[in-house]
Amino acid sequence: MNKLTIIFFTILLLTYIIVEKEALKIEDLPEPESYKKAKQLAVKDANGDKRAEGIALDFLRQNRRNCTVNCDLVLTCPLLTPECCPKKNDGCLKLDTVKNG
C-alpha cells in the first residue's frame, strides 16, 4: 500500500510539473511599453536599495499576473496588462490562466 501511494503521488507531481511547464503564462508574452516604464519607475524609486527593488518588481510581476483575470484588482491593471485590460485581445485569450479563470 505504501509503494502504491508513493507511486501515485510521484505520477501526480510529474503531471503537475509538465502541465505547469507547458501552460502559456503572461510572462511568455512580450512586455508592453507601459509595463517596462512601471518597472523603470520601481527601480528608480528604490534608490539603489536592491531589497526594495526586488520587492517592488515582485509586486509588479504578481499584479501583472493577477490582472489577467481580474482587471478591477488595482487601478493600474490597464498599464500592467494592456493586452487584457480593459478589453481582452487574442494574445490574452490564449493564456491558460484566462481560459481557466
From Swiss-Prot:
Protein purpose: Voltage-gated potassium channel inhibitor.
Sample GO molecular function, one term: potassium channel regulator activity
Subcellular location as annotated: Secreted
Keywords from the UniProt entry: Disulfide bond, Ion channel impairing toxin, Potassium channel impairing toxin, Secreted, Signal, Toxin, Voltage-gated potassium channel impairing toxin
Family: Belongs to the scoloptoxin-10 family.
Residues in the signal sequence: 1-23
Protein name: Kappa-scoloptoxin(10)-Ssd1a
Post-translational modification: Contains 3 disulfide bonds.
Keyword Secreted: yes
Organism: Scolopendra dehaani
Keyword Disulfide bond: yes
UniProt tissue specificity: Expressed by the venom gland.
Cellular component GO terms held in the UniProt record: extracellular region
